[in-house]
Amino acid sequence: MLTDMEISRQANVRPIGWIADDFGLGKHLWREAGHAMAKISLEAARAPLRGKLVIVTAVTPTPHGEGKTVTTIGLTQGLHLLGHKACACIRQPSLGPVFGVKGGAAGGGYAQVVPMEVMNLHMTGDIHAVTSAHNLAAAAIDARLFHETRLGCESFSAKTGLPALNIDPERILWRRVVDHNDRSLRQIELGLGDNNGPVHGGGFDITAASELMAILALCENIADMRARIGRVILAMSRDGKPISADDLGVAGAMTAIMRDAIEPTLMQTLSGAPCLVHAGPFANIAHGNSSIIADRVALAHHDYVVTEGGFGSDMGFEKFCNIKSRASGIAPSAAVLVVTLRALKANSGVEGDDRARLEAGFANLHWHMQNVMGYGLPLVVAINRFPDDAMAELDWLKERCLEEGAFGCEISDAFSHGAEGARALATAVARACDAPVNFEYLYDDEMDFGARLMTLAERYGAAGVSLSEDARRDLAMITELGMDKLPLCMAKTPLSISHDPSLKGAPSGFELPVVGLRLSAGAGFITVLTGKVMTMPGLGLLPGYLNIDINDKGEIIGLG
């Protein structure tokens, strides 16, 4: 079989204007961003919603993923093949995983967004806009600290006419960001050298973990984005008051940098189905879903909209339900859970023959099935087939899924056969979308912080929760600010349902260690840091960039 790059290169990429016409967008609602991309006006999101939203999730993945994006794109192509008007909504890839271990995020095989190298490398620069806006705030808070320290607060106010913020250098909360995996930047010292400001600690996160990325994904329009950015808390004053981006006077400039990034980007799949690519928060350290705006645009113009939540259902799907859907008010009509035989065996935690490993690993799939169905959604299990999968094992898995209450279960060959390989899956999903839905959140808005945290922990299988001293201090600050009722965004390993990647299957009886809390007042949630999770990834022993180069024709090679 050809590589993803070779398949993408051989694709008949249609002019993006044709895709926009099929989408149903008048010329005033989009503008070209090159031959293969278009930016969509926010006006396109104002039409009444007509479509049904399908959320794609997965079992606990192996490090290379189980084909969730392949399934999302393949399912969209399959629905398109059946004559339905269908659109995919996915996140913009971060350069971190592209050059790290996982590779690109455009799908794969014959279920791709094309051109894949355009999607995986920069696209329309939205992530860079988020990076620039975020780091402008970081520069502004340090500059204000420098000048107030140099002049003294009274003299600063007299010279500038601005109120002194009296920033506490030990309580600057706003870390810098960059769109790469770089562990050396996790903890740094700022202000070193003569006349560079008071020395204080800091660090970098990956841009996908930026609160601005979450705001981009959760806002409804430009005014909402501006208001949310203004509420972002950058630091605390020496007398314990929060200092927001509006207080610093930088929120307007930050929004200006992100003005064009708020518009979703229209691309196409190999079969010519439309795909909206917008925002890129990670699911393990952020809320892990594409934008509300993209969903609204797609739902206003299509019968079916297929989106995905990052990693397993304990990660992106949970946040889709409790953060994104809560913010948008849009409930999904059905869910698709992607599983592979490889993932079941990897999640078994045992050695032995394949059947024994499958039996043990099924506990993980069973947990994810119960988790998804617990939100009141019809569930279709998609078995993503690999070339060496044994048919007897696939049949066994399909039968078990149906026995455990799945609305449907189909083998997907989208990777190898594109739309035709997802025909059966698309048929099952269309049927599921007509089934009764009783969608509900996992916790109520009025539950206190401890009750909401324990509800999530118990869903993971934990017997209890422990808060470190840092986490308790963070909670005291958040409570004092009156923001302890915000939804929770769990930051943890994606390689286990628990906080510990070594706990396979469906662990239970463990204690969930909370090591810190981060308030995202603009995005509207509290990030709960657990275990040894890092908000800045690192490159591995054999990173993906080793495979990437450019040939004499100027073509990128080795990507994917």
UniProtKB/Swiss-Prot annotation:
Nucleus in keyword set: no
Residues engaged in binding ATP: 62-69
Keyword ATP-binding: yes
GO biological process: tetrahydrofolate interconversion
Enzyme class: ligase
Source taxon at top rank: Bacteria
Keywords: ATP-binding, Ligase, Nucleotide-binding, One-carbon metabolism
Reactions catalysed: (6S)-5,6,7,8-tetrahydrofolate + formate + ATP = (6R)-10-formyltetrahydrofolate + ADP + phosphate
EC number: 6.3.4.3
Stored Pfam families: FTHFS (PF01268)
Coiled-coil boundaries: none
Pathway connected to this protein: One-carbon metabolism; tetrahydrofolate interconversion
One example GO MF annotation: ATP binding
UniProt-listed NCBIfam families: PRK13505.1 (NF010030), PRK13506.1 (NF010031)
Family: Belongs to the formate--tetrahydrofolate ligase family.
Protein name: Formate--tetrahydrofolate ligase
Name of the gene this protein is made from: fhs
